[in-house]
Amino acid sequence: MSEYLLLLISTVLVNNFVLVKFLGLCPFMGVSSKLESAIGMSMATTFVLTLASILSYLVNQYLLLPFDLSYLRTMSFILVIAVVVQFTEMVVQKTSASLHRALGIYLPLITTNCAVLGVALLNVNEKHDFIQSAIYGFGAAVGFSLVLILFSAMRERLAAADVPMPFKGGAIAMITAGLMSLAFMGFTGLVK
């Protein structure tokens, strides 16, 4: 049990996919200007990342490895991710049309989010079992969501702040992201 808790904590805080591995930067910078859309993107990404991680493990274990098709791993994982994203988009469109409009192009772009594919491939490379794959996917999603929501809240405050003209917009966003990354480096010694 403690092994799973350590995996979760290390994935969320120590090895955060956005701030440490630099995966998922497109939605991190693109959807983080408003807190409402960041929360919606976080929920959608959490669902997609967790489910894609589980399904990718199953595809790898029960289709690719038994039939010696490991050379199709990346392509099959992208296909799994695309199916999960389409399912998620249909659910979001049916349940919350306003959230679907707010997320706009970023919801279908979860398919090309390198963090989602990165989690699936790292599960294979690190030889995680089924439960570890699910926890790793969920932890990566929680870490992504945590960083996205915190960054979005900071960007909303910065929009109202008196920022010097050369630093307005993307420049102050990059500085803020760098400072967040430094703050998360403080968790480095937490888990080995």
UniProtKB/Swiss-Prot annotation:
It is a multi-pass membrane protein. GO terms for cellular component: plasma membrane. Its EC number is 7.-.-.-. Its main location: membrane. It is found in: Cell inner membrane. The chain crosses the membrane at residues 5-25, 39-59, 65-85, 102-122, 134-154, 171-191. Keywords: Cell inner membrane, Cell membrane, Electron transport, Membrane, Translocase, Transmembrane, Transmembrane helix, Transport. One of its GO terms (biological process) is electron transport chain. Belongs to the NqrDE/RnfAE family. The complex is composed of six subunits: RnfA, RnfB, RnfC, RnfD, RnfE and RnfG. Part of a membrane-bound complex that couples electron transfer with translocation of ions across the membrane. HAMAP family: RsxA_RnfA. PANTHER family: INTEGRAL MEMBRANE PROTEIN OF SOXR-REDUCING COMPLEX, ION-TRANSLOCATING OXIDOREDUCTASE COMPLEX SUBUNIT A. This is Ion-translocating oxidoreductase complex subunit A.
